[in-house]
From Swiss-Prot:
Cystine bridges: none
Transmembrane stretches, start-end: none
Domain of life: Eukaryota
Biased composition (Basic and acidic residues): 260-272, 295-306, 436-455, 471-491
InterPro entries: Ankyrin_repeat_domain, Ankyrin_rpt, Ankyrin_rpt-contain_sf, CC144C-like_CC_dom
Protein name per the record: Ankyrin repeat domain-containing protein 36B
Molecular function GO terms recorded: identical protein binding
Gene3D superfamilies: Ankyrin repeat-containing domain (1.25.40.20)
Mapped ANK repeat ranges: 19-48, 52-81, 85-114, 118-147, 151-180, 184-213
Biased composition (Polar residues): 250-259, 355-367, 389-400, 579-600
Length: 1353
């Protein structure tokens, strides 16, 4: 059971039982080469299989026997046979790491690219085992490094999913595909991001992996990183993208990552409009122009329209060419919706040499409106001179949407006018529109050929667009109009467009209009147009009526124009409208012209069917030359009904010229009401004749005109109905004008041809009906038209149809109608077969999913069991550790005891040295037999002691070795743990450093501007402070000068006092002079005092100013602090805004996920409807699954029984070992007892000796003490041995407990098998219920089919 539930990598070994094998297999398993040689010599089949479909080579490779493999290979054994798991011997050898066997097989030509049941090759298992040498050998022998099944990983993806970094690096070096994807569209980068493997992500980015690849759910690796909140990986991918954009060339003008991230914001709608118009005018020498545009847009809005129009006109150099006003008006009509356009026009004039111009633009715009339009208009006009010119334009557009509606319209209109020599024009357009839901591709290729006499010209136009959408609306229109001829030679233009597109929903509409023809000179040409639409759908019905016929004849030269078109449009939504109208009318004076107008509007009713009408009626005759119409025109010019219920194309026509365009929703609703009878009608009612000569019409043409005249009443009725239903819109007026104009033309033609009416016969009408039925049989919706034609003919001819000829013809028409019904039934049967196949595939996938779920549940159960086993193993390890600790403690005790004994022996030796002479004298005296006995006893004791010492030394050496090994193991474990801890710490520190560096860079970037502003303010303040300091220094210098003066004045004053004394002593008579001098001095002192007061006042003023400046500085510091607080508040506000932004972004993502879930629910509903028919298959499959489950259960029970037996055998062996150990311990105990008895005898002898030698000295007392100590040591050893015996007994009891536990597990497994049987019974009941439901559904389907038959009859 475990083997069946494995993932292919677990349980690689074969589960072998003897009754599975045959003789050759047994010989291989036993390794008996001689028997194998004998069997091979007796012509025994070397490729014989056992009951498990294994060959001898399989077993030899699985068991790793290269000699056996060499022998089998030399006997030409088949190397590529598979076992039950579809595994070859090579796969088995690689899986089990048998490199020698694998190399032998590879050297002898084994195929390494064969896959097993799981879709894996030998390379997958080598990658899983991380066997690099084996991988190199496989690759050298031609292994495909990308080989795998659809549902399996490639080797590189397997290495990534298993987190094998070394193997990823090795495979990348071996040039594995980095951009490989799995069945869910996930690349290696997406897998690595989901697993959170940073190293693998770095490796993949180093090897330039595609970062923009999306999986089935439309998600990028960056999206998964953001969902997982793995900041490191997200930053790595973001930096890689930024570097890629920086490394792009200058002309490419890449979109910056900020813009890309802004495009993913929470805006409801986005508009991306880019219009490029390039006009290149060339001279006599050719020029090359290439324009590329790659816009990338993403929107989460309600509607999104993408319009791309390319109009290229190549005009002659010397001849004049003009564009008709009708064409200009048709090009203007496409842009009736709300479109914002960005026009970029580059014009490059080429002189005498060729030039190359490349323009690339990648706009990304974002708006918050409800409806968005994305228009891409490119118009290139190239004028050629005398020589040939080559123009190539490429356009690549990638638009992504998860919205409700998408429209994609591409209009191509090219006109070619050639001069004297040939020219080649190639235009390519490659738009790619992507949606996050299910998407498909569509391609259309256009080729044209022109032949001119001896000179051949080729015009190739390719258009491979890939349109992908799962939204509600999708418009795809291709309009191509191109025909011009010159000279007197006939030319051929072939126009092909074979696109293949698929539709999986309700309806498809494809409208293609091709019309343009011109005549020159006195020549006419023949125009034959064919249209072959190929539409594929799994919807209810698809109708398409291709009818085009325009022919004109001339006298001298005839030309043919063939136009083939195979459009296929894919839709997965409710409504689709695709309208394109390019009418052209070219009228010349004396020359004849051909006008071809085609209109195929497609209106969709809420019912299942739809109608597709194409009307082409153009025939203009020349004035001077009489033209004829061949009889091949009959099937194209016909009518399909005269009743009032059938509606002509007048109710569906859209005005040509400036009034042509898309249809309004009001008109659509009105037309849905009118066209309830699901009629497809083809009317050709435009015939204009002119000129100077008389022309005659053959009856073939007149019959068709008669039929169209009879349809006049129905046409007028439909026009009046349209008036009543619709409101007054411009589309209504267009329909009324069209119906009135057609009515007038038909009445004029009827008045001019009265005789032709009377010549119409029933035979001709019946021929027309037969031919019309043949043409309409190409499409599936022409049956009701044939029925109505027959009824109308019977109503017209009334009683004239009673003759046998007419009745036979009517019967023939009915037979043809029945044949058509049979053809349609066959087509329906084919579709049913396809649907059944798809349902079978879906049931198989569901089986696989259920099996995988069962495997997952079993794996979880196994994981729990393994965890239990791990717990038990951990407990056993802990017990072993405890045992080792006990052993170490015993070892230490033994060593201590040995040390003590050695010390005692040394003491005894020291004591015995002085006693030796006394002993010698005693020995001389004691020459009796007692002396001999004493000598014998001493020699025996010495031998015993030596033997014990040797045993103890051996045990000590053994214990030391064990201790050293245990210590080394513990140290290694500690070092490994420490190394891992250091590694983790180092990684965490590196991560923290990176994060801190990133945060620092961000904070530096944020605060750099603020710091700059603050530094500016600080510089201004510092300049002011410096000025104030300078002024203060000046004041201080002045104060110092004043102080110097005061000091000088004081000195003068002192000197004056001294002089005064001297003068008083010297000159007593000069008192008057002294007084005078005193007065002078007083006056000077007053002056100086005044100056001092002034200086003090100035110093006070300066102090006040300093105080004021200090206060101003304090105020500025407060202002600075206030500014800092405001900055902090702003930062907090910014953080809050960022949080709000993140929350809004999360809500937007949730809305997108809800929309995706809604789409998925729709798809699931469709799948559930389809699964009703598969119920029977499921029932059968469930029965098979139940049988398989029973087989698996039996195998599981058998495996468990075998495992239990093995476990029992192992336990029995363990018990035997324990018993042997117990016996061994008992023997040791007996030996110890014997030794104890001998020692007791020796002690008694020593006691006797002690009594004899008490008089000789006190040395014997020390010997007795040593012997007593030795005895105590032996007793301790006995106790330790008893403890060991107790431990062994406890282990034996634990083993018995384990046996009982295994027995309980077997009983539980038996209970599980009973539960599975009960579930089997329940499943059978459920299958019976489902069978009843299937029978009810079949009855309902039969009833519905009968009702449908009744309605059809």
């Amino acid at each position: 059971m475990e083997r069946l539930c494995s993932d292919g990598f677990a349980f690689p070994h074969y589960y072998i039982k003897p009754y599975h094998l045959k003789r050759i297999h047994r010989a291989v398993l036993r390794g008996n080469l001689e028997k194998l040689k004998y069997l091979l010599l007796t012509y025994y089949d070397a490729n014989k299989r056992d009951r498990k479909e294994r060959t001898a080579l399989h077993l030899a490779c699985a068991t790793g026997q290269p000699e056996m493999v060499h022998l089998l290979v030399s006997r030409r054994c088949e190397l590529n046979l598979c076992d039950r798991e579809d595994r070859t011997p090579l796969i088995k050898a690689v899986q089990l790491r048998q490199e020698a066997c694998a190399t032998l097989l590879l050297q002898n030509g084994a195929d390494p690219n064969i896959t097993d049941v799981f879709g894996r090759t030998a390379l997958h298992y080598a990658v899983y085992n991380e066997d690099t040498s084996m991988i190199e050998k496989l690759l050298s022998h031609g292994t495909n490094i990308e080989e795998c099944s659809k549902n399996e990983y490639q080797p590189l993806l397997l290495a990534v999913s298993r987190r094998k970094v070394k193997m990823v690096e090795f495979l990348l070096k071996k040039k594995a595909n980095v951009n490989a994807i799995d069945y869910l569209g996930r690349s290696a980068l997406i897998l690595a991001v989901t697993l959170g493997e940073k190293d693998i992500v770095i490796l993949l980015l180093q090897h330039n992996i595609d970062v923009f690849s999306r999986d089935v759910y439309g998600k990028l690796a960056e999206d998964y990183a953001s969902e997982a909140e793995n900041r490191v990986i997200f930053d790595l991918i973001y930096e890689y993208k930024r570097k890629r954009y920086e490394d792009l060339p200058i002309n490419s003008n890449p979109v910056s990552p900020q813009k890309q991230r802004a495009e993913k914001a929470t805006s409801d709608d986005k508009d991306s409009v880019s219009n490029i118009a390039t006009e290149i005018k060339e001279g006599p020498i050719s020029g090359t122009v290439s324009s590329q545009k790659q816009p990338a847009e993403k929107a989460t809005s309600d509607e999104k329209d993408s319009v791309s129009n390319i109009a290229t006109e190549i005009k002659e150099g010397q001849q004049s060419g003009t564009v008709s006003p009708q064409k200009q008006s048709a090009q203007k009509v496409i842009f009736k919706k709300k479109v914002s356009l960005l026009n970029i026009a580059t014009r490059i004039m080429g002189g005498g040499k060729s030039g190359t111009v490349s323009s690339q633009k990648q706009p990304a715009s974002k708006t918050a409106s409800d409806k968005t339009d994305s228009a891409l208009n490119t118009a290139t006009e190239i004028k050629d001179g005398l020589q040939c010119g080559t123009v190539s334009s490429q356009k690549q557009q990638a638009l992504k949407a998860t919205t409700d509606e998408e429209g994609s319209v591409s209009n191509i209109a090219t006109e070619i006018k050639d001069g004297e020599k040939s020219g080649t024009v190639s235009s390519q357009k490659k738009p790619a529109l992507k949606a996050t839901s299910d998407e498909k591709d569509s391609f259309s290729n256009i080729t044209r050929e022109k032949k001119d006499g001896e000179i051949s010209r080729t015009v190739s136009s390719q258009k491979p667009p890939a349109l992908k959408a799962t939204s509600v609306k999708e418009d795809s229109v291709l309009n191509i109009a191109r025909e011009k001829k010159d000279g007197e030679k006939s030319r051929t233009v072939s126009f092909e467009q074979p696109p293949g597109l698929k539709a999986t929903r309700d309806e498809k509409d494809s409208l293609l209009n091709i019309a343009r023809g011109k005549k020159d000179g006195e020549k006419t040409r023949r125009v034959s147009s064919h249209k072959q639409p190929s539409l594929k759908a799994t919807s209810d019905k698809e109708d398409s009526v291709p009818n085009m016929a325009t022919e004109t004849k001339d006298e001298q030269i005839s030309g043919t124009v063939s136009c083939q078109k195979q459009p296929a449009l894919k839709a997965t939504s409710d409504k689709k409208d695709s309208v394109s109208n390019i009418p052209t009318e070219i009228k010349d004076g004396q020359q004849s012209g051909t006008v071809s107008s085609q209109k195929q509007p497609a209106w969709k009713a809420t019912s299942v069917k739809k109608d597709s009408v194409s009307n082409i009626a153009t025939e203009i005759k020349d004035g001077q030359i009489r033209g004829t119409v061949s009889s091949q025109r009959r099937p194209a010019l016909k009518t399909t009904g005269d009743e009032k219920d059938s509606v002509s194309n007048i109710a569906r026509e859209i005005k040509d010229g400036e009034k042509s365009g898309t249809v309004s929703p009001q008109k659509q609703s009105a037309q849905k009401v009118i066209f309830k009878k699901k009629v497809s009608l083809l009317n050709i009612a435009t015939r204009i004749t002119g000129g100077g000569k008389s022309g005659t019409e053959y009856p073939e043409n007149l019959r068709t005109l008669k039929a169209t005249i009879e349809n006049k009443d129905s046409v007028l009725n439909t026009a009046t109905k349209m008036k009543e239903v619709q409101t007054s819109t411009p589309a209504e007026q267009d329909l009324e004008m069209a119906s009135e104009g057609e009515q007038k033309r038909l009445e004029e033609y009827e008045n001019n041809q009265p005789q032709v009416k009377n010549q119409i016969h029933s035979r001709d009408d019946l021929d027309d009906i037969i031919q019309s039925s043949q043409t309409v049989s190409e499409d599936g919706d022409s049956l009701c038209c044939n029925c109505k034609n027959v009824i109308l003919l019977i109503d017209q001819h009334e009683m004239k149809c009673k003759d046998c000829v007419h009745l036979l013809k009517i019967k023939n028409t009915f037979c043809l109608w029945k044949r058509l019904i049979k053809l349609k039934d066959n087509h329906c049967e084919q579709l049913r077969v396809k649907i059944r196949k798809l349902k079978n595939k879906a049931s198989v996938l569901q089986k696989r999913i259920s099996e995988k779920e069962e495997i997952k549940s079993q794996l979880k159960h196994e994981i729990l069991e393994l965890e239990k086993e791990l717990c038990s193993l951990r407990f056993a390890i802990q017990q072993e550790k405890k045992k080792r600790r006990n052993v170490e403690e015993l070892h230490q005790k033994v060593r201590e005891k040995l040390r003590i004994t050695e010390e005692q022996y040394r003491i005894e030796a020291d004591v015995t040295k002085p006693i030796k002479p006394a002993l010698k004298s005693a020995e001389v005296e004691l020459k009796t037999g007692g002396n001999n006995s004493n000598q014998v006893s001493e020699t025996d004791e010495k031998e015993d002691l030596l033997h014990e010492n040797r045993l103890m030394q051996d045990e000590i050496a053994r214990l030391r070795l064990e201790k050293d090994t245990i210590k080394n193991q513990n140290l290694e474990k500690k070092y490994l743990k420490d190394f891992e801890i250091v590694k983790r710490k180092h990684e965490d520190l590196q991560k923290a450093l990176k994060r801190n560096g990133e945060t620092l860079a961000k904070t530096i970037a944020c605060y750099s501007g603020q710091l700059a502003a603050l530094t500016d303010e600080n510089t201004t303040l510092r300049s002011k402070l410096e000025k104030q300091r300078e002024s203060r220094q000046r004041l201080e210098t002045e104060m110092q000068s004043y102080r110097c003066r005061l000091n000088a004045a004081r000195c003068d004053h002192d000197q004056s006092h001294s002089s005064k004394r001297d003068q008083e002593l010297a000159f007593q008579g000069t008192v008057d002079k002294c007084r005078h001098l005193q007065e002078n001095l007083n006056s000077h002192v007053l002056i100086l005092s005044l100056q001092l007061s002034k200086a003090e006042s100035k110093s006070r003023v300066l102090k006040t100013e300093l105080h004021y400046t200090g206060e101003a500085l304090k105020e500025k510091a407060l202002v600075f602090e206030h500014v800092q607080s405001e900055l902090k508040q702003k930062q907090s506000q910014m953080k809050d805004i960022e949080k709000m932004y993140k929350s809004g972004y999360n809500t937007m993502e949730k809305c997108i996920e809800k929309q995706e879930r809604f789409c998925q629910l729709k798809k699931q509903n469709m799948l559930l409807q389809q699964q009703l028919d598969d119920a029977r298959n499921k029932a059968d499959n469930q029965e098979k699954a139940i049988l398989n489950i029973q087989a698996r259960c039996d195998a599981r029970v058998q495996n468990l029984q075998a495992e239990c037996r093995k476990h029992r055998l192992l336990l029995e062996e363990d018990n035997k070992m324990l018993v042997n150990e117990l016996n061994h311990s008992k023997e040791k105990e007996c030996q110890y007892e014997k030794e104890k008895a001998e020692r007791e005898v020796a002690v008694r002898q020593l006691q006797q000796k002690r009594d004899d030698v008490l008089n000789k000295g006190s040395a014997t007392k020390a010997l007795l003490d040593a012997s007593s100590r030795h005895c105590t040591y032996l007793e301790n050893g006995m106790q330790d041995s008893r403890k060991k015996l107790d431990q062994m007994r406890s282990q034996f009891q634990e083993i018995q407990d384990q046996l009982t536990a295994t027995i309980r597990c077997t009983k539980e497994m038996e209970g599980d098998t009973q539960k599975l049987e009960v579930e089997h019974v329940m499943m059978r009941k459920i299958i019976k219920k489902q069978d009843d439901q299937i029978e009810r559904l079949e009855k309902i389907l039969q009833h519905s089919s009968l009702m449908l038959q009744v309605f059809e009859s």
